[in-house]
Amino acid sequence: MPKRTDLQSIMIIGAGPIVIGQACEFDYSGTQACKALREEGYRVILVNSNPATIMTDPDMADATYIEPITPEVVARIIEKERPDALLPTMGGQTALNTALALASDGTLEKFNCEMIGADATAIDKAEDRLKFRQAMDKIGLESPRSSVAHSLEEALDGLDYVGLPAIIRPSFTMGGTGGGVAYNKEEFIDIVSGGLSASPTQEVLIEESVIGWKEYEMEVVRDRHDNCIIICSIENIDPMGVHTGDSITVAPALTMTDKEYQIMRNASIAVLREIGVETGNGGSNVQFALNPENGRLVVIEMNPRVSRSSALASKATGFPIAKVATKLAIGYTLDEITNDITGATPASFEPTIDYVVTKIPRFAFEKFKNAKPLLTTAMKSVGEVMAIGRSFPESLQKALRGLENGLSGLDPVEALVGANPSVIEAELARPTPDRLLVAAQALREGLPAEKICEITHYDPWFIARLAEIIAAENEVISNGLPLEAAAFRRLKAMGFSDKRLADLALQSAHLRGLGKAQAKGSGIVHDALQAMTGGVTEAEVRTLRHSLNIRPVFKRIDSCAAEFEAKTPYMYSTYEAPFFGEPVCDSLPSNRKKVVILGGGPNRIGQGLEFDYCCCHACFALEAAGYETIMVNCNPETVSTDYDTSDRLYFEPLTGEDVLEILHTEQKNGTLVGVIVQFGGQTPLKLAAEIEKAGIPILGTSPDAIDLAEDRERFSALVSELGLLQPANGIARSRDEAISVADKIGYPILIRPSYVLGGRAMEIIDGPSQLDDYIHTAVKVSGESPVLIDQYLRDATEVDVDAVADGDDVVVAGILQHIEEAGIHSGDSACSIPPYSLPASIIEEIKSQTDKLARALKVQGLMNIQFAVKGDKVYLIEVNPRASRTVPFVAKADGRPVAQVAARVMAGEKLRNLPEISWPEGYTAVKEAVFPWARFPGVDPVLSPEMKSTGEVMGIDIDFPMAFAKAQLAAGNALPRAGTFFISVKDSDKAQIVEPIKALTDLGIKLVATDGTARYLQSKGVPVERVNKVREGRPHIVDLIKDGAISLVVNTTEGWQSLQDSASIRSSVVLAPVPYFTTAAAAIVAAEAIVAIKARELEVRSLQSYHSMKHA
C-alpha cells in the first residue's frame, strides 16, 4: 500500500548521550529515519539531547530540539509542535521508554499523536518480562524457566522455583543494565536490589541459568501485510552468560545446521507476529539460546526496535534496516521499497552474503581503577570493530588488528607462554575480553581442543579454525616466509597482516640462535637472516609480498551474493584466490579527483562519536565542492560507514598496510588529491607519516606541524619564542629524573605520557610517594616516549578554543569556559559557550594567542587549544592542530558547519569565500559529560586528568543557569528543587560558596555538613546541621545517602588523603543515585541553576529558532 497521506508531521525521539549499551548506532538509525521521512515529504520534528550526532544537525529535521529526553520535556514539545505521529523505534531504550510513558500518561491521546512503527501494546509486550514470557507460551515457544518479581521478597520466593545459578534481567532496560548472574544467595540479593532500582517499572525477571549455551540472534523485518524477511543471522562466539554486546559475533551464523536455521527463522517470524499483532513492526531483533548437548532451543528476548545488532546487520549485508523500517512505519510494504544497493531488487528480497563478518567489542577497563575485567550479562564494552573477509580466519584477524589495541592478528598472550596447564585452564575459565586469544594460546601450549571447548563453551568449529591459524604460524616459525606466490597468498588469505608475519619470521630467526636486536639490526647478519626468513620487519615482508605480486582485491557488499550488480561502491578487501584464474578486483576506481578521509575506528573513551561527526561533515563538504569522497573506517555503529555518506566506502582496518593498499588501488584511475587525517582523532594521525612517506599528500596541517604540537620539547621552544606563558614543566625518561623534575617544579604536579588521546594515564600528584607509585604504570603506557611533568595550576579556570585557519586568516569558532577547574580532563568537564564569567580582556587575550599559534604552526584546517586562566594570567596548556571532540557542540551552538568549513579550507579554499563563523548571541549552550560509573561498581567516581566519560549532552537556553539545569537533567543528574543537601568543602572553597548556599536555604532547602564546613557556614549566618564523617562514627553521611535522606551532595577535596577519605561518599551517591559535585565552581553554578528552575518553568525551543535569533 502507498505511504500514508493522513500524516503531515512526524516526531522522532533520539537515544540521547552515548552510554555503554546505547551508542552511536542510534545516530546511524535516527539519521536514516530523518532522511527517509523528509524524502517522502513529511515535516520531521526531532528530539535528542546529544549534540555530537549527525541527526541533530539543523538541516536534518525541520525542527530540532536539543532538549532533555524525559516524558515531561517531550510532552511540552508535542504540545508546541502538535505532530501527527511519533516514531519511537529509532532511539533505543530511551525512546521506547519515553514513548511508553507518554502513552500511559495520556499525552499522545490528548494531542492526537499516533505511535507508528510499534504501538504501545507491542512495546509493552516485548519489554515487560512477564508479558513476553506469556506471549511465548501462547505461540508454543519455550523460554528459560523463570519468575517475575517486583520486590526482593518476591524475588527470593521465585528463587526457590528457578534455583541457582540464576540470571537477573530488569525490565525496560538496555545493555543488561542492573542485571547479572548470581551464583549464591548473597550475590542474588545484591543483583536483584540493583536490578529493581535500574528498572523504570521496578520489575526483574529471575531466569534459570543457560550459561554456556550457544547464543544466536535473528534480525527480522516485517511489514503490515505480514511479509517477513530475515536480514541476517548472527552467532555469538562467546556463550550465554556474556552480554551479546560484549561477545565476539559472526554473521552469518556459521555452526548451525540448515534444519536449526529454519526452525529459528520460523520462530523469529512467529515472535514478531505475536508481539506486533496489529502493526508493522519494521526492524526487530530476536535472541535465542541453544543447548549444544540436546538441541533445546529457548527464546531469550526480543527488541521491538532497531538495535545495536540492527546496525551490525545493516553494515554486514548492505540492507538499510532503519531506512526500510521507517518506510514501513508510514505505510509502505516491503515489495514497494527499492533496495538502494542494487537499484534493481525490492526490499522484500532476503539479503544473501558470500563472505564472513566478525564483530569484536572494544573495552576500557584500563580507565577505571579496581574495575574487574570480567564479562557478565551486564554490558561493559565502549565500542566495537567490524571486519569482512572471505573466510572466518581472514575476517577474525582483520577485526583483531582493527581494534587498535596493539594486536596485529591472533597474537600470543605473553603472560601464558610456557605457563603450567592449570594456570592456562584457570584463565580460560574467566570470561575476559581476551579469552579468544587465551584459547589460541592454550592451543599453542598444547592443551587439547576438547578441553578448551569444555572450559570455555566455545563451539569446536571455532577452535578448529584457531588451530588452522596456529598451524600456519608454526609453518612460518619453522621455515620462514614462503617465497612462492601461491603459498604466500594462502597466508594472507587467512588474514595474516604483514606485521604479524614479520613477528613470526622474527621468531624463526630467533630459533636460528639470534636475539631480536641482532635480527632487526643491519649489516651482513641481518641480510643473511632476511634471505633465510623472507624478512623480519613489516617493511621487508611488504617488499617481499609486492615482489611476488600479491595484493588484495576489493569485493563489493551487494546484499545478493553477486546475483545483481551493486550500484553503490561499498567494499572490503580479500586475498582469497579463486579456484581458476586470477583474483578479480571489483573496486573499479573512478577517473574523478578524489579525497580519502580516514575515520576513527572503534569507539573508545577519548575518541568517539564527535570525531565521526567531523569525518561525515568532511564528506558532505568535499562532495559539495566537487570531489569524490572516499571513506575508510571499520566501525559498524557510525554514520560514516553508511553506504550513502561518502561516494565510496572501504570497510577496512585503519592500519598502515590496509590503508596503503586502498590508496594504491584508488591511484590507478583519476587523481588522488590527498588524504585527510585531521578528523578521525588519534587513529589516522598515527598513519600520517607512513602515508606521506609513500608519496601521498596529507591535506591540511602538515604532519611535521602536528608532531611539533605533540612533542613537548619542540613545542616548549615555540611557546618561549612567541612569548606566551606555560605552566613550569619538564620531561623525564626515568624514575630518578621524574623525582628531580618534580622537586624543581614543586608539588602539585600533573604527570602524563606523551602522544595520548583522552588523557590516558594522566594524574595529579601531590607528593613524592604518590609519584613513586604512579611511575610504574606511566612508563608502561609511554613505551619509548618520555614522561611529561607540568606544574598543576590548582583552582584555575580551563578554557577550550576551537579555531579554523587557512594560512592567511584565523577564525575563532568558539571559546568554551569549563565549569570544573583546570586539571580535570576537558572531555569530562562541563563547559559553556559563550563563556559565562570570563572578562572581555581575557577573551581578547585568548583570541590573540590563538591567532599567533595558528600562524606559527601554519595550521590549515581545524585547531583546538586549551588554556588555563588564573587571576589575570592566561597559561597555554596544549595545542592540537586537528579536530577536537568539542567541534560538534560548537557547530550546534553556533549554527554554522565548522567541520565543513575546515574541510573546504584543507582542500585549498579560503575562509573569506566560505560561510562566516560567529558566536551565539542571546542564548547560552552548556555541554555536560555522561559517565559509566554504574557499570563499574567499586570504581571511585572521581574526575581527574584521565578521561572517563562515554558521551555528552547539551542544554540550551536564553540564560546560563537554566541551560546548565537542562544539561544536568539531560545527563540523568536532575537538580532537586527541594530536600536536604550535604556540603563538605576544602578550606579554600568555603568563602566562595557562602552566598550561593545561603540562597538555597532562603528557598527552604535544608543543609547538613561535616564539622569544619558546618562551623564555618554557621559563623556566616547560614542554617546548617552537623553530620559525622565516615570515620567519626555512625550514623554518618554515607548512612544518610543510602537511606535516601540526601538530595544533593557537594564534596570538594584537597590532597591525596582527603580524596581517599571521601571515596565512600562518591561511591554511595552513584548507587543512590544522587546529584553530586566535586568542585566549588560546579556547586556554585548548580546552586544558581536550582534558583533558576524554582523561579521559572523550563521552556522548549528548537535549535532553528535559537539560530534565527542569532542570525536575524
From Swiss-Prot:
Residues 133-330, 716-907 form the ATP-grasp domain. One of its GO terms (biological process) is glutamine metabolic process. Mn(2+) 2 binds at residues 301, 303. Mn(2+) 1 binds at residues 287, 301. Residues 405-587 are annotated as: Oligomerization domain. Binds 4 Mg(2+) or Mn(2+) ions per subunit. It comes from the Bacteria. Its cofactor is Mg(2+); Mn(2+). Residues 973-1112 form the MGS-like domain. Keywords: Amino-acid biosynthesis, Arginine biosynthesis, ATP-binding, Ligase, Magnesium, Manganese, Metal-binding, Nucleotide-binding, Pyrimidine biosynthesis, Repeat. Mg(2+) 4 binds at residues 878, 880. InterPro entries: ATP-grasp, CarbamoylP_synth_lsu, CarbamoylP_synth_lsu_oligo, CarbamoylP_synth_lsu_oligo_sf, CbamoylP_synth_lsu-like_ATP-bd, CbamoylP_synth_lsu_CPSase_dom, MGS-like_dom, MGS-like_dom_sf. Residues 973-1112 are annotated as: Allosteric domain. It catalyses: hydrogencarbonate + L-glutamine + 2 ATP + H2O = carbamoyl phosphate + L-glutamate + 2 ADP + phosphate + 2 H(+). Mn(2+) 4 binds at residues 878, 880. Composed of two chains; the small (or glutamine) chain promotes the hydrolysis of glutamine to ammonia, which is used by the large (or ammonia) chain to synthesize carbamoyl phosphate. Tetramer of heterodimers (alpha,beta)4. This is Carbamoyl phosphate synthase large chain. The lineage of its organism: Bacteria, Pseudomonadati, Pseudomonadota, Alphaproteobacteria, Sphingomonadales.
